[in-house]
């Protein structure tokens, strides 16, 4: 458990952790490239390590260290055992597609209790359109998933754009193996597009080209066939999702902090956290590779479309508690199918602290109360809730006890140490 007490001031310079999204994609691309790749500044978090270990089961040789991962990619081989991806939905979804391209046999992919509840059917349906056999062992669209090796036999695949961008990323990373050019056609408006921009960016660095396309008012992507992944040296940038908690702490508390390793021109959608706090009234200084914050600021409630930024919702919910007026979060139906139902969880748990939150079908309405009280909070094994609730606890009267703090190892392994280094009054017990 994490014990959080009111924190009068924070100050210091700290690095944002490396990007989880970039690390996942880069290690998988490197494993598919014949030759030696070097990933510098990777995220040594549980989810990304799941991707690395899974790639080893498909034949890659990977040397892991804190500063870099050295990866010798090879032709895909059939795993000798069941591929257990732990709690990483990204790993499960990308490798479900990729595993269809082993030369022979079957792949079985599974994960922990949480992963075995995450929806997979849209991806399985898409693979079926491509002529790939895959199925849920429970016949309910969840892991364990069985995938049979096979050639891609159809050139067009249709998939919803409003479920999970990870399904589309999986197709983007699999279709270059096709002997023919392919198209992905989105049948509904796209959500979380920045994550697909990250996928396209990483693929490009490894020699694979994806072209955005629109036909008959439907967005989609074109992928050339017979493409080959090429090894490279790749530097992982800092993670704006994880930096959002540092930004929130900076604008809400008496602060003087510099957050390094976050880039002004990043393709990450969650860089929007900077614009959000600015619109709420914070005078944040954004430089080429860092953010400087001297708080606190008097924030005002605003309306925020979270179509492309679902991971920022817990952070926004906490900011809204201390803003004047109402903060409205909308277009967030997909936030319900993350590690947990984050809309319901934020409503229930922050209400225990005295927050005024109304849960809507696609979002939240938060009325600023300016003052929260310490409480015992559940986090449902969700790393983003742990970190967002920690910031709330640092401003609350009394003591806040947060369960499940171990989940931060997924995306921000040294979160507690870094927060303590700038003066946060938190302890693990």
Curated annotation (Swiss-Prot):
Source species: Methanococcus maripaludis (strain C6 / ATCC BAA-1332)
Keyword Cytoplasm tagged: yes
Subunit record text: Monomer.
Pathway: Metabolic intermediate biosynthesis; chorismate biosynthesis
One cellular component (GO) term of this entry: cytoplasm
Any one GO molecular function term: 3-phosphoshikimate 1-carboxyvinyltransferase activity
Residue sites binding 3-phosphoshikimate per the record: 20-21, 25, 164-166, 192, 311, 338
Compartment(s): Cytoplasm
Gene behind the chain: aroA
Catalytic residues as annotated in Swiss-Prot or TrEMBL: 311
The name this protein goes by in its record: 3-phosphoshikimate 1-carboxyvinyltransferase
Residues annotated as signal peptide: none
Main location: cytoplasm
Pfam hit, one: EPSP_synthase
EC number: 2.5.1.19
Coiled coil regions in record: none
Family: Belongs to the EPSP synthase family.
Binding residues annotated for phosphoenolpyruvate, in chain numbering: 20, 89, 118, 166, 342, 384
CDD domains, alphabetized: EPSP_synthase (cd01556)
GO terms for biological process, alphabetical: amino acid biosynthetic process; aromatic amino acid family biosynthetic process; chorismate biosynthetic process
The entry's keywords: Amino-acid biosynthesis, Aromatic amino acid biosynthesis, Cytoplasm, Transferase
Stated role: Catalyzes the transfer of the enolpyruvyl moiety of phosphoenolpyruvate (PEP) to the 5-hydroxyl of shikimate-3-phosphate (S3P) to produce enolpyruvyl shikimate-3-phosphate and inorganic phosphate.
């Amino acid at each position: 458990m994490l014990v959080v007490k009111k924190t009068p001031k924070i100050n210091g310079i700290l690095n944002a952790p490396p990007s989880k999204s970039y690390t996942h994609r880069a290690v998988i691309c490197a494993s598919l490239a014949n030759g030696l790749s070097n990933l510098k500044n990777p995220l040594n978090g549980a989810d990304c390590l799941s991707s690395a270990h899974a790639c080893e089961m498909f034949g890659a040789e990977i040397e892991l260290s804190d500063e870099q991962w050295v990866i010798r990619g090879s032709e895909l081989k059939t795993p000798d055992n069941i591929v257990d991806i732990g709690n990483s939905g990204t790993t499960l979804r990308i490798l479900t597609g990729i595993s269809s391209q082993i030369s022979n046999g079957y792949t079985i992919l599974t994960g922990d209790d949480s992963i075995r509840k995450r929806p997979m059917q849209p991806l399985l349906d898409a693979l079926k359109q491509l002529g790939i056999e895959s199925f849920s062992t429970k016949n309910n669209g969840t892991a364990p998933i069985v995938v049979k090796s096979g050639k891609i036999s159809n050139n067009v695949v249709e998939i919803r754009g409003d479920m999970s961008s990870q399904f589309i990323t999986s197709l983007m990373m699999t279709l270059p193996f096709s002997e023919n050019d392919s198209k992905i056609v989105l049948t509904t408006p796209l959500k979380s597009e920045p994550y697909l921009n990250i996928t396209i960016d990483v693929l490009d660095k490894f020699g694979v080209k994806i072209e955005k396309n629109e036909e008959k008012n439907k967005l989609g992507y074109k992928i050339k066939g017979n493409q080959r992944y090429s090894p490279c040296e790749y530097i992982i940038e800092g993670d704006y999702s994880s930096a959002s908690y540092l930004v929130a702490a900076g604008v809400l508390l008496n602060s003087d902090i510099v957050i390094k390793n976050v880039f002004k021109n990043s393709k990450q959608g969650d860089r929007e956290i900077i614009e959000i706090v600015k619109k709420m009234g914070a005078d944040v200084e954004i430089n080429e590779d860092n953010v400087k914050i001297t708080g606190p600021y008097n924030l005002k409630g605003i309306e925020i479309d979270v179509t492309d930024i679902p991971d920022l919702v817990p952070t926004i919910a906490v900011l809204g508690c201390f803003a004047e007026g109402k903060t409205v979060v909308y277009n967030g139906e997909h936030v319900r199918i993350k590690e947990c139902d984050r809309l319901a969880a934020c409503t229930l748990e922050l209400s225990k602290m005295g927050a005024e939150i109304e849960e809507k079908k696609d979002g939240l309405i938060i009325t600023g109360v300016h003052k929260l009280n310490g409480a015992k909070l559940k986090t449902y094994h969700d790393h983003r809730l742990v970190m967002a609730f920690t910031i709330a606890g640092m401003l609350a009267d009394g003591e806040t006890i947060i369960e499940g703090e171990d989940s931060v190892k997924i995306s921000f392994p040294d979160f507690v140490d870094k927060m303590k280094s700038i003066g946060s009054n938190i302890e693990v017990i």
